[in-house]
Structures are given as structure tokens and as C-alpha cells.
A protein has these predicted regions:
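Aromatic-lined substrate-binding rim segments of carbohydrate-active enzymes
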Residues: 61-127, 208-213
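Aromatic- and acidic-residue-enriched segments that line the glycan-binding/catalytic groove
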Residues: 90-96, 120-144, 190-200, 236-243
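Conserved, mostly hydrophobic/aromatic
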Residues: 41, 68, 76, 107, ...
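Bacterial N-terminal signal peptides
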Residues: 11-19
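Active-site neighborhood of glycoside hydrolase catalytic domains
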Residues: 153-231
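Catalytic-core region of carbohydrate-active enzymes that cleave or remodel glycosidic bonds
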Residues: 245-310
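N-terminal carbohydrate-binding accessory modules
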Residues: 23-75, 105
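An active-site-proximal structural segment forming one wall of the substrate-binding cleft
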Residues: 99-116, 139-176
């Protein structure tokens, strides 16, 4: 075994030795307090991997989730794809590979906590960022802004989502520990400077309010590039940074937008990268990922591998 393989094996062992409690089939508590994540009253880092339920045949969900647990992770994160479920106005589908609730239940049975990322915009290299195509046919519709027609539809979506998975929150004995409000909204704010910042912030706050009004009562969070928190963060939600490798910068910017304290999390830590036509294959080294993982672990930084599978 060469030195790099030894280092990766060591990191996997270290991940598995971090105390995460006996999660499987056990009711747990989760809270953000004193700058840390607490599981069952103990400071616990979130060691997460992203895996999207519709990108894996449902017959393989349990096997893949079990593999995630075996590699030392304690959490799985997933987007929720609005256009996957509401294929036509008012026509909902949560069967088969779309059975989000079953996916979450299996994750809990396999000892994993769950981070839910419902958008309503999700990016994820998914058609229309997860928005249903038919939104474009509604008169007066302006997506992703403080628009009555749009917010009416996002409310229906979020309420329907709560019907499916609300009882699976950790507050009700389930595995869902956190829910993301919007998604990388700071990037959109940076691109849409024609819209006043205050309007962007109103919209962002209203999505957060819709989640709370529907019944989601676990901690909410946002995820953005660390230089985009001004537009992407929203009061009452933990700001997390995507792709941030500089721990000092991560802690500085989170402190600025979160009352001077953590916890600190990289909600998208990239062990791979997407490929575009006619571009060179992304060159990401195993050794670099191993070193960065070690840095996070040594500095009380939680993370979510984007992606682990799927």
C-alpha cells in the first residue's frame, strides 16, 4: 500500500472513530448551540455526503446508503426536485424513484441523519434548476423573486413537501436534522443587479417563512460561496460556505453573518467536478481531497461531500 492509500485509509478510520452515537432506529435530538452542532446532547460534527434519490434506482437506495455509513459518514444530504414531483399544476408524483419519504426512512434505518435541500431552486445540473416547466405559462409569473404568482406556487410546493416528509424531522423522531432555505441565492443576487438588494432579501426571507409556516421546525441554513453571503444569507438561518478550503476565511465570514459564532460547515465540498463539452477533464487529486478532509476534521469544520454518489 503506497503512502497516499495509507493516508486515505487513516482518514476513513478517523471518520469512523468520531463519536456519532447509535443512530439507527433510535430517536435522537439535534440542535445548534454555543457555536456547535449537538446530537443527543454531545458536540458532533456533521460528516455528510450528497446523494440524490431520483438519480439512483430505488432498489439500490439501501445499499448505497449503507456504503455511505460504512465509509464513516453520519449524514446524507439531498436536493428535492420540484419539477420531478409536480409534473403538471396540482399533479403530484412521489412513487418509485420519486419516493422521497421512503428514501429518508431508509437513511434513518441505516444510521444516517438527513439534510434536506428543497430549494425551490436547486441547480444540481438539473433541468430548469428544478422548476416545473409550466411556471412559464402562468400570466404575471416572475421566477425567483418577490412575485405573488411565484410565491403562491412555491407555497403549494413547500406545503406538499411537508405533507410527505414533515413527520420525518428529528423534532418528531425522524432523521431530518436541517433544511436548506433557497440555494446559492447569493450567486443569483450577484447576477441580477437589476433587482434591488432589498427585494432579493424580501424574497429570500419569504421562502424561509414559507418553510417555517409549513411546519419545518428543524434548523434552517443557507449555502453560498463565502464571498456571496451578503446576498445569500438570511437572518435566522445558519450560513454555510460552498467550496471553501480556507478554514480561517470560512470562520471569519460565518462569524460576520452569524453573531460571531459557528458552527462552521462547508455544505458543498467537491471531491469531483462537472464536465462541459470541449473542456479538459477536471483534474482533482485524491491526495488533495484527503488533505482537505484532514484540515476540516482538525479544525472543527463539518462538511458535505458533493457528490458521494449519483
Amino acid at each position: 500500500m503506497d503512502s497516499m492509500k495509507k493516508k486515505i485509509a487513516y482518514l476513513l478510520l478517523l471518520l469512523m472513530l468520531i463519536p456519532v452515537g447509535s443512530f439507527a432506529k433510535e430517536k435522537r435530538t439535534f440542535e445548534i448551540k454555543d457555536g456547535h452542532f449537538y446530537v443527543n446532547g454531545k458536540v458532533t460534527p456533521i460528516l455528510s455526503g450528497e446523494m440524490h434519490y431520483p438519480r439512483i434506482p430505488h432498489q439500490y437506495w439501501r445499499h448505497r446508503l449503507r456504503m455511505m455509513r460504512a465509509m464513516g459518514l453520519n449524514t446524507v444530504a439531498t436536493y428535492v426536485f420540484w419539477n420531478l414531483h409536480e409534473t403538471e399544476p396540482g399533479k403530484w408524483d412521489f412513487e418509485g424513484d420519486k419516493n422521497l419519504a421512503e428514501y429518508i426512512r431508509i437513511a434513518g434505518e441505516e444510521g444516517l441523519m438527513v439534510i434536506l435541500r428543497p430549494g425551490p431552486y436547486v441547480c444540481a445540473e438539473w433541468e430548469f434548476g428544478g422548476y416545473p416547466w409550466w411556471l412559464q405559462n402562468i400570466p404575471g409569473m416572475e421566477i425567483r423573486r418577490d412575485n405573488p404568482e411565484f410565491l403562491k406556487r412555491t407555497k403549494l410546493y413547500i406545503d406538499k413537501l411537508y405533507e410527505q416528509v414533515g413527520d420525518l424531522q428529528v423534532s418528531k423522531g425522524g432523521p431530518i436534522i436541517m433544511v436548506q432555505a433557497e440555494n446559492e441565492f447569493g450567486s443569483y443576487v450577484a447576477q441580477r443587479k437589476d433587482i434591488p438588494l432589498e427585494e432579493h432579501r424580501r424574497y429570500n426571507a419569504k421562502i424561509k417563512r414559507q418553510l417555517a409556516d409549513a411546519g419545518f421546525n428543524v434548523p434552517l441554513f443557507t449555502s453560498d460561496g463565502s464571498w456571496l453571503f451578503e446576498g445569500g444569507s438570511t437572518p435566522g438561518a445558519l450560513p454555510t460556505a460552498n467550496g471553501e478550503s480556507n478554514v480561517e476565511n470560512l470562520k471569519k465570514v460565518v462569524n460576520e453573518y452569524h453573531g460571531g459564532v459557528g458552527p462552521y460547515m462547508v455544505a458543498e465540498f467537491y471531491p469531483g467536478w462537472l464536465m462541459h463539452w470541449a473542456e479538459p477533464f477536471p483534474d482533482i487529486s485524491d491526495s488533495g481531497i484527503a488533505r482537505q478532509t484532514e484540515t476540516y476534521l482538525q479544525n472543527d469544520v463539518s462538511f458535505n461531500f458533493y457528490m458521494v454518489h449519483g
